[in-house]
Each structure stands twice: as C-alpha cells, then as structure tokens.
Design a protein with these regions (language model features):
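Metal-dependent polysaccharide deacetylase catalytic core of the NodB/CE4 family, i.e.
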Residues: 190, 196, 350-477, 534, ...
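Helical hinge/lid and interdomain linker segments adjacent to catalytic or ligand-binding clefts
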Residues: 110-191, 363
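Catalytic beta-strand/loop cores that center a nucleophilic Ser/Cys/Thr
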Residues: 216-281
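Catalytic grooves of carbohydrate-active enzymes
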Residues: 320-329, 334, 445-448, 452-468, ...
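Aromatic-Pro/Gly-enriched surface loop or interdomain linker
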Residues: 47-148, 317, 344, 353
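Catalytic domains of cell-wall/extracellular-matrix polysaccharide-remodeling enzymes
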Residues: 431-521, 576-581
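C-terminal domain-boundary segment and adjacent tail
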Residues: 131-136, 307-317, 335, 339-362, ...
Length: 603
C-alpha cells in the first residue's frame, strides 16, 4: 500500500520484509511518472540468525539437548560411550607446506548437520591465512595435529546418553601432547580431560572442564555482551535458541599454570561476568560456537581475531575501510551519481561501483503498467558518469545481470534492484522474506548464461569487464558461486554456504549458513571473497528493524577494531544525499581506518 513519506513528498511503497534466513530484505521506493527510477529495496544485509529456517530448528533442538545433557553430567548421571579404538599403524605425517589449518567438526547425533555448517564458517575464516583441511572429527588419525600449523575443533554435538563419543582418543591425546595451537570451541572438552586424566589436564591447563557447566545458579542467564580488547561486542540470542556459554572452573594455587582470560561474557540482567574465551599452554577455549545470531558488532569478532594468534601471530596492526556504491542500473539518476562521485574524489577515497547492466520492469510497476527494459548502452548519461567515476578512483563491479527474476514477484515485484536474481523467495504471512531455494533451471549453464549476458552489456556500453562480483541480495546456489569464481577474480559480498559442500555431496538447499567476513578469505567454494561487514545506511525503520544511521555504522567499525588486521566495509545507495555518507566516512576515518579500493582488500 502507498503511504506518504516526508522525503520530497514522494509516495513510497511500504517495505515488506527482511530475509529471515541468512540475508535481509529491505525497502522499496516509488516515484512519480517521469522520474528516473525507484529507490531499490535495501536488502543486502545479513540477518542476525545466519542460519536457514531448518537449521534454526536444529539449533533450538540442539540447545535443549545440550542443557539436558549438561544437567545430567552435573549430577553424574550422564554416561558417555567412548569412540571405538581403531588399531592402525600411523606413518609419520609430513607437515603441510606454508600456513595450514585443520578444522575438525562433529557430524553425528540428531543435529550433526549443524557441525558442517559451523565447520564451513570456520574454514572460510581460516582461508584468510593459508590452506584449510576440514573433516569430521571421527576421521582424525593419530599425529594429525602436528601436520598443520593449528587445529580448530568445533564441539557442536554434546556426546552422552544415546549419542556415543565420536572424538577418537587419539585426538584427545594429541591435543594434550602437541605444542601446536589447538582451539577448542563448545562441547566435549570435559571428555578430553577425562580421557587424558583430569589431574594431568588441570596441571597443564589450569582449569577443570569436568566441573565446568553451561548453567550458573540454575540458569543459563542472560549473557548479552562479550568484552574483548576493550570493545563491547553484542550477543543477542532469543530464549529457546540459546545453548549457553560454558563457565570454566579456573584453578589457582601451586601446581596450576596461570590461565589468560581473553574475552569476558556479561549477564545483562545480573551484571555477573565470566570468561568467554581463555588460553593456557597450547589450548585456546571458547565457551560457545559463535556463528548463530550474529550481527556487525557481534562476539564472533573475538574468534575472527584469535585466529591470528594461531595462524599468523606476527601480524601487524592495520585497519582499512572500504565503501561501495550500490544498485546502479541504467535507470540511475546521473546527477545523484555525480554528486556522490564529486565528494569521494574531493576526499581522495577509492571506492567500488556495483552496476547492474540491464534494467527490467516487466510488469510496468514504475512505468504506468507498461513493461520497460533499459540497457547501459541505452543510458549514455549514466555511462558517462560511470566512466568519470572510473577515471577518478572507482573500480567497476558487476551486481548481477538484471537483479530480478523473469516476471515473477521474487519476492516483491519483478523489478531490477528489488528482487532476487539467482534464488527464489517469497513473503510469508508474517511479512518475512523466506528463501525457497535456487530456481528450477539453476545449473552451471544457466548461471554462466546470465553472466555472459551481463558482461556483454558492459562491453556494449564501452565499459571494461568488471573484475569483481556482488550477488544480488547476497543469495545464490553452490553451483552459481562456483561459476562466479570462474568468471571474476573475487566476490565482494556476504554469502550462503550449504550443507553437503564439505562432504562433496549434493548441497542441501534447506540447510545453510550465511556469513560475512572482516578480511578477505578463500572460501569453501574455492573463491576469494572480499569483506562487507558493517552493513549500509538506511534512514527509516522497516519490518521491525530500526534505522541504520551513520552512528550505527561507525559503532560497528569501532567494534571491528578488535580484529588486528581487519576491514570496515560498507555500501551506500547513491540516491541518498551526500551528507550521511560524509558523516559515515569521517567517523570511520576518525577511528584510525584508512580507506582503500576493493582490489587492495585481498592484500
């Protein structure tokens, strides 16, 4: 329905929804006949969940099972069946060349599918540093930890009762014996202590996992903040989804080494604090897996930085920033483009321009019911502004072919910039955007066809081939992501990662994790992904989501200062005035960030 807004007196269609799967929806604007173009929906942002609806159900059930098992363990009533011992002779393993990470994950039990999602997220981050090997922990063989620079184990299955321990005794023993960094996240650290001897564990690490639990005072509490490097990071997990944070039982006195508290969790109701991440000897322990309900200022930042300690400890402090201009189509307003470009040039700020080469309004939503298609070649004034941008510090980026899907409402109206292109979606009765999966025709050939047509659109307008890609509304299939990697040097975006990817099976489009990064990574699709991690300017509240103003972007940039070599990367729609962009850039620069172009982000 139409309602009047104060901005220039123009009518605006109410925003319908944000993506409640891995990415968010946004706002759709309408202009009077004869105007250049509607303002697209601001949909390219990550949802605080970062898991698909099916994976959300898994998460809730796993949280309940964790709490039940933890209570049984506290009373001594939880029986843990050890993993079977495989009698094999292990040959000496040669270390991997260069920096390498071993990511071990759980994949057994009724919610074992969560383990692969978390492992992909971890492998992606570790891909910033070097090569990554990810495998189920059950496939671990003796001596493997010494083959890699560092090892990360993700304890997502709470072993006990009807779910036998899948962690081989060899891993427990090797994690204890090695001098190489081991990062343990979440469950089953108590089983390691039991396997190697509780006293021996205590004497090496200075704490007792067998006396550490998720509840304190009979409750998980209301942990809503994690402090790390003087940055207050958010932790916002709704009731019923929270599996808690382990409260480590630290030991003091003769015979126990000092334990370093790296990050501190705080209960928002009681004010009580406890360690969220600790380190002693070669072991770093995090009290929860931090990949669900993430935000731009989230506690996942702690893990993103701690990986430097394990994989690149000599890294020098460096903080860079990046801005890209979003959703520029052949129907963009040249004067608006020129205004933004002039400001960025005056500040000597390099930037990216995300361009959609073909505009389509197949049902005439913004053209009085008359279908409309406009190519870049048919928009010389827009192309002139794009060329001026390229001559003054901009880098051309490809933002889809049409940024919409046929004549379908996908999920809104079929118009370029508003709808998904490489994924199907609908709006449910609660005004949530739900991802339905890839289009029926999705394939390598189909995706390549759209890319080929997009590149032809740039060439026909006399523009160079874009080196970088950003997926419309940040959603595509695993097949599409691999095709994109064959056509562009990198993607600059947030992405979806589907169950089945690590195992080499058919991707499960109903189970995925969405992720964004504070630095460049080589992801599990084999593609370089450049960061966008602090979101975008959006001045109006919509879909129960508050406005995101310059102060919010700056606050997220401040939180990301905790990443020792991180980026504060955001995007801005050029139909908005220059002033909010100026405020955002000045605020980020005041934090000590240096703005760079997109190609520098991979360095």
């Amino acid at each position: 329905m139409l309602n009047k807004r104060g901005r220039s007196g123009k009518a605006r269609i109410s925003a319908i929804a944000l993506l409640l799967a891995a990415l968010l929806g946004g706002v759709l604007f309408s202009w009077p006949a004869g105007a250049a173009i509607s303002k697209p929906r601001s949909t390219d942002a990550v949802n605080p969940l970062a898991l698909s609806p099916e994976s959300k159900k898994d998460l809730a059930a796993a949280a309940r099972a964790r709490l039940a098992n933890d209570r049984l363990r506290r009373t001594g009533a939880l029986t843990v069946t050890p993993a079977p011992v495989t009698k094999t002779v292990t040959a000496a393993l040669a270390p991997q060349a260069g920096t390498s990470a071993l990511v071990l994950y759980d994949n057994t039990g009724p919610y074992g599918q969560l383990g692969e999602l978390y492992a992909m997220a971890t492998a992606n981050l570790a891909g910033h540093f070097g090569t990554v090997t990810a495998k189920p922990v059950s496939a671990y063989t003796a001596g493997m930890v010494n083959q890699y620079t560092a090892t990360v184990y993700l304890g997502s299955t709470y072993y006990g009762g009807t779910v036998p321990d899948a962690v081989p005794a060899a891993f427990y023993q090797d994690a204890m014996a090695t001098s190489r960094p081991v990062t343990w996240i979440g469950d089953n650290i108590w089983n390691m202590a039991t396997a190697v001897g509780v006293l021996q564990f205590e004497q090496k690490y200075g704490w007792d996992p067998t006396n550490s639990y998720y509840e304190s005072g009979g409750s998980l509490g209301d942990i809503d903040q994690v402090t790390y490097k003087n940055q207050q990071l958010t932790r916002n997990i709704p009731a019923g989804q929270d599996g808690g944070v382990l409260h480590p039982a630290l030991l003091t006195g003769p015979g126990y080494p000092a334990v370093t508290t790296l990050a501190v969790a705080k209960d928002g109701t009681t004010g009580a604090t406890s360690p969220w991440a600790i380190r002693s000897s070669n072991l770093t322990y995090l009290g929860e897996i931090p990949f669900a309900y993430v935000s731009e200022s989230d506690r996942v930042i702690v893990f993103e930085d701690l990986l430097f300690d394990a994989l690149a400890p000599a890294t020098t402090e460096r903080h860079r920033a990046f801005v890209r201009l979003e959703d520029i189509s052949p129907k963009a307003d040249p004067a608006q483009l020129r205004s933004i470009a002039n400001y960025l040039k005056s500040q000597n700020i390099p930037y990216g321009i995300n361009v959609i080469p073909v505009y389509k309004d197949p049902k005439g939503v913004y053209n009085n019911g008359v279908p409309e298609t406009v190519t870049l070649a048919q928009a010389p004034a827009v192309v002139t502004e794009l060329k001026n941008m390229l001559a003054n510090g901009a880098v051309l980026m490809n933002h889809g072919y049409t940024h919409q899907y046929g004549t379908a409402n996908n999920p809104y109206n079929g118009v370029t910039g508003d709808d998904f292109e490489f994924f199907r979606a609908h709006v449910d009765t609660a005004d949530n955007v739900v991802l339905d999966g890839p289009p029926a025709e999705d394939s390598t050939v189909w995706a390549q066809g759209r890319i080929t047509q997009a590149l032809a659109g740039f060439a026909a307008a006399g523009l160079p081939k874009p080196a970088l890609w950003t997926t419309p509304h940040y959603a595509a299939s695993a097949t599409d992501y691999r095709v994109l990697g064959q056509n562009y040097s990198a993607r600059l975006e947030r992405s979806l990662y589907f169950a089945g990817t690590l195992t080499g099976g058919t991707p499960d489009n109903s189970r995925y994790i969405g992720q964004f990064f504070p630095y460049s990574v080589k992801d599990v699709y084999g593609t370089t992904v450049l960061p966008e991690n602090i979101g975008n300017y959006e001045p109006e509240a919509y879909n129960n989501h508050p406005p995101r103003l310059p102060a919010d972007l700056i606050a997220s940039a401040k939180a990301n200062l905790a990443v020792r070599d991180g980026v504060a990367s955001f995007f801005y729609h050029p139909y908005y005035p220059v002033t909010p962009l100026k405020q955002t850039i000045e605020g980020i620069k005041a934090l000590g960030y240096t703005f760079v172009g997109p190609t520098a982000l991979g360095q």
